[in-house]
């Protein structure tokens, strides 16, 4: 477990703080949300990444209504703080982010300070499987493209539920593999091989299915569980990624700021694009509320 955590920490220490993908995503370390069939553009990529956050909150019925919106939020796997900064600015919610990477925390603190949000946003170094917060601390618990790095996803979700206040919404955005057919016990060997290559290059532990997420949540104090397949909403990102990273600006940004780690990430993202086209890889949204 410690070895896996160290690999994830080094992965993000080596890529995100130095901005290997900054030219494409800005302060966000996740894909954007697009209308299906849209042609993604470099000029709109950062707005699409911010829209992903807004769509996640909308999916969880978070309203910009002072009487209904959460007072505070926890972002697990916060990266360089883009989600926390966006939510604090757009919704006025007090935000806390947590990540394994000390370098990401330093970068996130700098971004929050530059936005004048030191009083609204803060960041901790910590483990998602052992969150350093009391039970029922947060009115909203969110994670975007983080749980893929964790082997024990059920424990990750238990921790999300634990630190959520009664009735608080919980939101998970994650890559996942396709759901199995009723007669299948596992993915096909060639599918497993593809996913292993992707996971190895991105410091991911493994991928599960959206059905797995639902199964784990039904065993916990969670209600109003719902899922959505957003694969078509993220797929426009991949052609843009391939186009822009092979420009001089894109390639030098990857090579100079991210080095070999970022190049491996690019290769994995190319495999992800094909796996999504083949129906093997999905981008899923899951939300629920902690039972009162």
Curated annotation (Swiss-Prot):
<dbReference type="GO" id="GO:0032259">
    <property type="term" value="P:methylation"/>
</dbReference>
<keyword id="KW-0472">Membrane</keyword>
<dbReference type="InterPro" id="IPR029063">
    <property type="entry name" value="SAM-dependent_MTases_sf"/>
</dbReference>
<keyword id="KW-0017">Alkaloid metabolism</keyword>
<feature type="short sequence motif" description="Vacuolar targeting signal">
    <location>
        <begin position="135"/>
        <end position="141"/>
    </location>
</feature>
<comment type="subunit">
    <text>Homodimer.</text>
</comment>
<keyword id="KW-0808">Transferase</keyword>
<dbReference type="Pfam" id="PF08241">
    <property type="entry name" value="Methyltransf_11"/>
</dbReference>
<feature type="region of interest" description="SAM motif II">
    <location>
        <begin position="134"/>
        <end position="142"/>
    </location>
</feature>
<dbReference type="InterPro" id="IPR025774">
    <property type="entry name" value="MTs_g-TMT"/>
</dbReference>
<comment type="pathway">
    <text>Alkaloid biosynthesis; ajmaline biosynthesis.</text>
</comment>
<comment type="similarity">
    <text>Belongs to the class I-like SAM-binding methyltransferase superfamily. gTMT family.</text>
</comment>
<feature type="region of interest" description="SAM motif III">
    <location>
        <begin position="161"/>
        <end position="170"/>
    </location>
</feature>
<keyword id="KW-0926">Vacuole</keyword>
<keyword id="KW-0489">Methyltransferase</keyword>
<protein>
    <recommendedName>
        <fullName>Norajmaline N-methyltransferase</fullName>
        <ecNumber>2.1.1.392</ecNumber>
    </recommendedName>
</protein>
<dbReference type="InterPro" id="IPR013216">
    <property type="entry name" value="Methyltransf_11"/>
</dbReference>
<dbReference type="GO" id="GO:0008757">
    <property type="term" value="F:S-adenosylmethionine-dependent methyltransferase activity"/>
</dbReference>
<dbReference type="GO" id="GO:0005737">
    <property type="term" value="C:cytoplasm"/>
</dbReference>
<comment type="function">
    <text>N-methyltransferase involved in the biosynthesis of ajmaline-type monoterpenoid indole alkaloids (MIAs) natural products, important plant-derived pharmaceuticals used in the therapy of heart disorders. Catalyzes the indole N-methylation of norajmaline to produce ajmaline. Also able, with a lower efficiency, to mediates the conversion of 4-methylnorajmaline to 4-methylajmaline.</text>
</comment>
<feature type="region of interest" description="SAM motif I">
    <location>
        <begin position="71"/>
        <end position="80"/>
    </location>
</feature>
<dbReference type="GO" id="GO:0009820">
    <property type="term" value="P:alkaloid metabolic process"/>
</dbReference>
<keyword id="KW-0949">S-adenosyl-L-methionine</keyword>
